[in-house]
């Protein structure tokens, strides 16, 4: 409705104009644990259940609640949605636990995974049904999904401490990001200029070498300003 009609009708025939929305992401929240389904979307695409253009993020209520307790920035959540619904991640990485993906994201590795897959993939993943012949049409060669290792040890320790099951104090997991860039994102957020949410997510999504370059540039700005 948002992408096609640029809005929706509310009660009493009131039109909600959403033409200013620039980015739309689909979420499917389930009461039951759905990790095998949510982390292996490629089979749903191959079966024709969903298309590749708007892959939803399928998550259980429990995992979403855990993520909401950790995440404190809407821009970070938007970046995570971008990563989890990108075909390069959805089709080439697999795990039985959604929180493995989220912890990998907090470590900055999921963003790196996304860049690596985009850079190395000359062709998109093969989404054609398997007819048993070993020949697939139109979508490139099939590649087995990379199975993620468990990344939830620190998360488990924090949850146990928060719930009173452990006396060992553990810091809440946080996104790895340079302090200078954190301050820049915070300033953009405070000003609430048009596009601040997407711009902040773009900054969070910078590769490590890009982060270093930007930090270096920000460090030099005061001296350059004095010269001018």
Indicate where each model-derived feature is located.
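Acidic, metal/cofactor-coordinating or nucleic-acid-engaging core segments within structured domains
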Residues: 3-15
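Short acidic loop-to-beta-strand element that houses the catalytic metal-binding Asp/Glu
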Residues: 1-2, 228
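Composition-driven low-complexity segments enriched in polar/acidic and proline residues
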Residues: 33-228
């Amino acid at each position: 409705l948002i992408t096609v009609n640029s809005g929706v009708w509310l009660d009493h025939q009131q039109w909600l104009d959403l033409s200013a929305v620039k980015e739309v992401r689909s979420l499917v929240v389930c009461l039951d644990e759905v990790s095998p389904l949510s982390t292996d979307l490629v089979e749903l695409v191959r079966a024709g259940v969903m298309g590749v253009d708007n892959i939803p993020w399928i998550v259980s209520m429990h995992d979403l609640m855990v993520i909401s307790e950790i995440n404190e920035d809407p821009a970070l959540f938007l970046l995570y949605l971008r990563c989890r619904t990108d075909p390069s991640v959805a089709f080439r990485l697999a795990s039985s636990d959604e929180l493995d993906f989220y912890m990998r994201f907090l470590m900055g590795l999921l963003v790196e995974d996304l860049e690596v897959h985009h850079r190395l993939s000359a062709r998109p993943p093969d989404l054609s049904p398997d007819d048993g012949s070993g020949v697939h049409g139109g979508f490139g060669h099939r590649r087995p999904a990379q199975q993620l290792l468990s990344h939830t040890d620190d998360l488990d320790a924090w949850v146990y401490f928060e719930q009173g099951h452990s006396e060992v104090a553990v810091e809440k997991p946080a996104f790895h990001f340079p302090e200078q860039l954190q301050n820049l994102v915070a300033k953009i957020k405070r000003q609430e200029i048009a596009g601040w949410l997407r711009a902040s997510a773009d900054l969070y999504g910078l590769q490590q070498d890009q982060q270093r370059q930007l930090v270096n540039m920000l460090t030099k700005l005061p001296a350059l300003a004095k010269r001018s």
